[in-house]
Amino acid sequence: MSPRQQPRRIARELALLSLSQIKGNPENLEQQTLNDLILVAVRTLTLEIQETLETAAAEISRGNERILASDTKATNLKSAQTMVKEAISLTHNAINRLGTVIDFPEIVQLSSQYEVREYALELIGTVYRRRAEIEQELTGALVDWQLHRLPRIDRDILQIAVAEMLYLDLPQKVAINEAIELAKRYSDDEGYRFINGVLRRVTNKLNESEKAVSTQS
């Protein structure tokens, strides 16, 4: 089984893409089928594709305006080139997301569906129930940032990782590595490096607290 098809890895992706749209109270979670989770995930990705393409179209339009004005100002041409490059990059990202939308349902079907559903719902429920404690840990590890100011996808990846470390008995190193993999797929280069740094500070503080408790006892 490829890493992408491992049930828990798929469950993390489902949880990440569903976290902002599914209420985590027990009554609601019990009613969620695997198909419900897949539908929410696909809708989330589709919305992101639409927003990315709209941004790319706006960049191309602005770049075209700068090119038309380039006869009078050389700086306009350079600025237009930058905008077009950004639009190409955004379009490339949207195409990658489209591939994920197409592949994701099949990948889920090829995995252990029961395990995927159970772990995805456990992650969503844990983040929902323990949000205050999780956010406290993350806030203490942020440097020159506020948690609510982070991009939603980065914030959700961080919350899932801390939930797994603190409440689902996932080893710290594994939780960090899995979070980085999620960030590489759904965030950007700056995002996954930022997430890596925050989670390492979280684990350092957790380990220091454990040592302090051991010393006192």
From Swiss-Prot:
**GO: which molecular function terms?**
RNA binding
Task: Please name the GO terms of the biological process aspect recorded for this protein, alphabetically.
Answer: DNA-templated transcription termination; transcription antitermination
Q: Which cysteines are joined by disulfide bonds?
A: none
**The organism sits in which domain of life?**
Bacteria
Keywords from the named record? RNA-binding, Transcription, Transcription antitermination, Transcription regulation
Of the GO CC terms on this record, one is: cytosol
State the Pfam families in the record: NusB
| Function description | Involved in transcription antitermination. Required for transcription of ribosomal RNA (rRNA) genes. Binds specifically to the boxA antiterminator sequence of the ribosomal RNA (rrn) operons.
Family statement: Belongs to the NusB family.
Q: What is this protein called?
A: Transcription antitermination protein NusB
List the lineage, top down. Answer: Bacteria, Bacillati, Cyanobacteriota, Cyanophyceae, Oscillatoriophycideae
